[in-house]
C-alpha cells in the first residue's frame, strides 16, 4: 500500500532532514487541498504528523489538522504529541482510523498497553525510529536524541503480543534524505516476524525503491519528500505496486 505523508509545522506543510527541526523546508501547499489531491489520486491511506505537537504537546496543531481531514474519504493515521488516553480518544473521535505512537511506545510501555486494551489494537500504529549500532537496531526517542534501553525486535514482540500488527519503522539516517530506503532494516523485521505489517518510511526516492520494498513484502510505503518534490506521482507509485 502506498501511504502519502504530510508533516505539519506552524500550520504549514514541511519536511525535515533526518528529523532535525533546524533543517525545516516549507512547502507552499494548503493542507486540506494536498490531502484531497492524494486521496483523489487513489491513495488508500494517508499519514499525518503534527511536528509542533511532537516537539511541545502544549502547541498542538490538532484543530488545523482536523479541519483539513474533515472532508477526507480515505482512512488516515496521525501522530505527534499523543501523550495520554484523552489524546487517543480525541483523534479517534475526530475520524482518524489509527493513532501513531512513537516515543511513548518505547518509554511508557505499560501506559500504551492500557490504551491498546481500551481502544483496540487495530487503532494503533507503533512507530519505531532506529539507529544502526554494533549490536543491532536501537530505537531512539524525543526527536531521536535519546537511545532506548530496549532493542527494536524486543519492542516489536511486546506490541505484537498485544495484537498490534502495524509497525512504522524508520532508519533515522535515511529520513528525508531521498538516498534509498534501509532495505536491511525491513529484511530483519520481516524475517523476525512475518505476521506483522511493516510500514517503510525514509529515503524512498525512486519507483525502483518502491518495487524492491514491495518484493520484500512490506505492508505500506510512506512517501513524503518524494511526492512533495515531484520525483514521481501517487499514480506512478501505485502502478508499480500492482
From Swiss-Prot:
This is 1-(5-phosphoribosyl)-5-[(5-phosphoribosylamino)methylideneamino] imidazole-4-carboxamide isomerase. It catalyses: 1-(5-phospho-beta-D-ribosyl)-5-[(5-phospho-beta-D-ribosylamino)methylideneamino]imidazole-4-carboxamide = 5-[(5-phospho-1-deoxy-D-ribulos-1-ylimino)methylamino]-1-(5-phospho-beta-D-ribosyl)imidazole-4-carboxamide. CDD domains: HisA. Belongs to the HisA/HisF family. It is found in: Cytoplasm. GO terms for cellular component: cytoplasm. One of its GO terms (molecular function) is 1-(5-phosphoribosyl)-5-[(5-phosphoribosylamino)methylideneamino]imidazole-4-carboxamide isomerase activity. The active site is at residues 7, 129. The lineage of its organism: Bacteria, Pseudomonadati, Pseudomonadota, Gammaproteobacteria, Alteromonadales. Pathway: Amino-acid biosynthesis; L-histidine biosynthesis; L-histidine from 5-phospho-alpha-D-ribose 1-diphosphate: step 4/9. HAMAP family: HisA. Keywords: Amino-acid biosynthesis, Cytoplasm, Histidine biosynthesis, Isomerase. The gene is hisA. One of its GO terms (biological process) is L-tryptophan biosynthetic process. Its EC number is 5.3.1.16. InterPro entries: Aldolase_TIM (IPR013785), His_biosynth (IPR006062), Isoase_HisA-like (IPR044524), Isoase_HisA-like_bact (IPR023016), RibuloseP-bd_barrel (IPR011060). It comes from the Bacteria. It is an enzyme of class 5 (isomerase).
Amino acid at each position: 500500500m502506498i501511504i502519502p505523508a504530510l508533516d505539519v509545522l506552524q500550520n504549514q506543510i514541511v519536511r525535515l532532514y533526518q528529523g532535525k527541526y533546524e533543517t525545516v523546508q516549507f512547502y507552499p501547499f494548503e493542507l486540506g487541498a494536498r490531502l484531497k489531491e492524494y486521496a483523489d489520486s487513489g491513495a488508500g491511506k494517508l499519514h499525518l504528523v503534527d511536528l509542533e505537537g511532537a516537539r511541545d504537546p502544549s502547541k498542538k496543531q490538532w484543530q488545523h489538522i482536523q479541519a483539513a481531514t474533515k472532508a477526507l474519504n480515505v482512512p488516515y493515521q496521525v501522530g505527534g504529541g499523543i501523550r495520554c488516553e484523552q489524546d487517543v480518544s480525541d483523534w479517534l473521535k475526530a475520524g482518524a482510523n489509527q493513532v501513531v505512537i512513537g516515543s511513548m511506545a518505547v518509554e511508557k510501555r505499560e501506559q500504551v498497553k492500557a490504551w491498546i486494551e481500551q481502544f483496540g489494537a487495530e487503532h494503533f500504529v507503533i512507530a519505531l525510529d532506529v539507529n544502526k549500532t554494533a549490536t543491532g537496531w536501537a530505537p531512539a526517542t524525543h526527536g531521536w536524541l535519546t537511545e532506548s534501553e530496549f532493542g527494536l525486535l524486543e519492542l516489536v514482540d511486546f506490541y505484537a503480543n498485544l495484537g498490534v500488527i502495524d509497525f512504522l519503522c524508520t532508519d533515522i539516517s535515511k529520513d528525508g534524505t531521498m538516498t534509498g530506503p534501509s532495505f536491511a532494516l525491513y529484511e530483519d523485521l520481516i524475517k523476525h516476524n512475518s505476521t506483522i505489517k511493516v510500514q517503510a518510511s525514509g529515503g524512498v526516492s525512486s519507483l525502483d525503491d518502491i518495487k524492491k520494498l514491495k518484493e520484500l513484502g512490506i505492508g505500506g510505503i510512506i512517501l513524503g519528500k518524494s511526492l512533495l518534490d515531484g520525483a514521481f506521482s501517487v499514480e506512478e507509485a501505485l502502478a508499480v505496486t500492482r
